[in-house]
Curated annotation (Swiss-Prot):
Source taxonomy: Eukaryota, Metazoa, Chordata, Craniata, Vertebrata
GO cellular component, one term: extracellular region
Propeptide segment residues: 75-86
Coiled coil ranges: none
Keyword Signal: yes
Alphabetical list of InterPro entries matching this protein: Glucagon, Glucagon_GIP_secretin_VIP
Pfam families in alphabetical order: Hormone_2
Localization: Secreted
Family: Belongs to the glucagon family.
Protein name: Glucagon-2
Amino acid sequence: MSNASGTLLSYMFMMLLGLTLASLVPHETDDGDLNAEISLANRHSQGSFTSDYSKHLDVKQAKDFVTWLLNTKRRGVDAQAGANLEKRHSDGSFTNDMNVMLDRMSAKNFLEWLKQQGRG
């Protein structure tokens, strides 16, 4: 586990512990202001946690994308794409040459068949 992940987990644990403790504080029914303050504190801590966690996920996603981008460049995906394009071109050229040859053979066979039909 990396240091940043460990720090994040510690931070998340502390936030969850704080939320749990805040929810366990006894509510005084005589004083509505105390309940309102606790409620505001809970909402603030939940909002702060959500905001910080979202920022962390955005940064992690950006780092993962950059890592992926660098890895694909290093592996030579661009070179592979060029090789695939050349292979497709050569395959297409071969197929085209075969089609031309087969068309000529078919025409030659047809002419020979016509000649044989004319003799008979």
